[in-house]
Amino acid sequence: MIKRKLFSELIDHLPQKEMSLIFGPRQAGKTALMEMPKTHLDQRGERTLFLNLDIEWDRPHFESQAAFLKKIELELGRKRGYVFIDEIQRKDDAGLFLKGVFDLKSPYKFILSGSGIFAQLYRQIQPRTMLCHQSQFEQNHQNRPNNYLLFAFS
């Protein structure tokens, strides 16, 4: 696997409080990109949690902001931790849900990925975002020519 430039940018952004967003079409490598910094953090002994809205047993934790934060606190404690959420577009009103969680100023860093209507989430938080596109080199070395990923900071 090509080590993506986005991986370096994502690692550089991990110390920042803002959410990190990764989005693009299906099968573009979003989950693989998210797993790279998680592995990096796990190897450093950091607290991490990976939730996937495609997985049935992860979904109940997204029924309310309180349930979501309780799950995170049970897994990571009340200290700094990293929460990876894959397929966030499956959450109804994901933008409002996440904005509310972010506004609570919890000690957790959120790294999110999604596709499709996930672009609507980006538009909801766009005033606080910056985009970094997948490099042309990486696009040229993909098996599927039309793949792209966007990485945004909220």
Where are each of the predicted segments found?
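Phosphate-binding site recognition
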Residues: 1-154
